[in-house]
Amino acid sequence: MPPIYVLQQGAKLCINNRRLCIEYEGETLTSVPLAHVSQVVLFGNISLTTPAIDALLAQNCEVVFLSQRGGFRGRLV
């Protein structure tokens, strides 16, 4: 599965029914079955719920944090 890139500033990643959901201003922009996620790349001001972090780590998904312009900030493995 290719990485999931999230660029929408202010977006939030959460888990709903074993799906990784990307929400913005209370609306779900998209969702992907958690089983199809191998890596998530976040650009800038993106938040993750604790259940999303737990689910991604349990699935051995890498989460990469970048600045809005793509500078490396860190990662969860």
For the regions a language model picked out, list residue spans one by one:
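N-terminal intrinsically disordered, cationic/polar leader segments
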Residues: 1-77
